[in-house]
Amino acid sequence: MKEIAAAVIRRDGRLLLCRRAERPGDSCAGLWEFPGGKREPGESLEDCLVRECREELGVQVKPLRVREQLTHIYPEITVRLTFFDAELTGGEPEARVHTALVWALPEEWDRYPVCPADRPLLERFREEETP
């Protein structure tokens, strides 16, 4: 099982979503996800989150708290995702490994098909946003 740290970054009521690049054998290619990535040996999940956001987005983030942990089984891999609420502390996100980035409002989320592992968290956000 691969350990993944993912950042939930908000700005003005919007969530940052990233579109995955097309890669052979990647069942999430072309879908949208929260930024983050795989933990390296000996690395804490918080350090993983900071490193992945720096490498993939060119930004500094501060992990604030664990929002949720989920396990998902893809055809090619089983992952355990730890979603952190994170504060953007330096830089402006840029798509270094993704094909696109978007700051999406809740009413726009349906326009962005997300990876199956991220879908439950996005649905919970939708419930929180509904009066």
Predicted regions and their residues:
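Short, glycine/serine-rich, charged loops/turns that create anion-binding
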Residues: 14, 22, 71
